[in-house]
């Protein structure tokens, strides 16, 4: 049977399932470690600092390299980059489970970050290339279920698997899912940009981006420990500022930049990407609220995770509803409604001064609104970003969009954790949690304002 060409191939359910399975290798499986930190400490006989590095480094490296991977997908092939990403996940998972050596755990998690960097922009580009109109919006809904839904389920999933089967089974299952994804994607004709010449890769831009983001991450996670007046803190801050400035200058002059700032001339794309960064940042809600109910109320990790079940159920249900709202009202209204509902949920979860029973009720309702809001927002936002990118730059555009997701989550968790720790030490746990959750609500409010100002009422999508 003759293999279909790029011109004749139409995206089908087989390919879509393969794409979704590849996406959840990061958002569901790799992110599940957030709920098994104490178990990893015992298994690897190491301290919590080392484990926290291993947990956070995946999202950080994904965010740092996702834009570059998007450019590579445009140039060398989106199917090829997706397959490379899946294989990297298998390799990273194997390194994590084969020994009790902390260094291999960190290296494995780093490789999983590179895997996610390859998979996310490449799969979005495949959807852009092979699905049209309502089929694309449906495909993006399922992609969003894999990403937003996976992130909602990961904490509960990780705890359940670790309790019932052992934590290594998280990555054994991830390897199995990866192999199935490779099989389902096999046979799909390659898609790449026809107009981009194979210029030299922007290594200088990538190096500066990595230096800048690593510096910022150190400042956020270790700033209070270092002291803001210490020479080391000031030095790292200077490195972050200088590398950021050099990066902007270099990228504007480069003929083949890592980040094409021309994409941000489109207000709809800018609004979707910036709001996506901020709403991924509210992932800090989970770590703050879970830590508070365990330390402040004496709940177990399973009990803490159970409070957020309404979140994961609602985000999975509402993603398809968000797709229908997109088709009916365009992108702006669902994005605004989703963000507003999320802010209400944040405010309810932040009421840590209430008596235990009332707070638990507020938490359950708050998580319900939290998931409802994210579910409504997800598909319209993703569709806005992808539809407003020119076809020859869709890989880079998708890469920037997903960089916003990964870095928003990484820095949101880091900031929330830092604020919680600092304020708790100065006052008490209740106040520390409340202020940290207000920070997350503030990010939601800022996201709402950005959508209101930048995303047009009737989006001129390039379908």
Swiss-Prot record:
Q: Output the superkingdom of the source species.
A: Bacteria
One term of GO molecular function: transmembrane transporter activity
Q: Which UniProt keywords apply?
A: Antibiotic resistance, Cell membrane, Membrane, Transmembrane, Transmembrane helix, Transport
Q: Which GO terms describe its cellular component?
A: plasma membrane
PROSITE patterns tied to this protein: MFS (PS50850)
Topological relation to the membrane, as annotated? Multi-pass membrane protein
Q: Which GO terms describe its biological process?
A: response to antibiotic
Q: Where's it found, cell-wise?
A: Cell membrane
Q: What is this protein called?
A: Quinolone resistance protein NorB
Q: Give the organism the record lists.
A: Staphylococcus aureus (strain MRSA252)
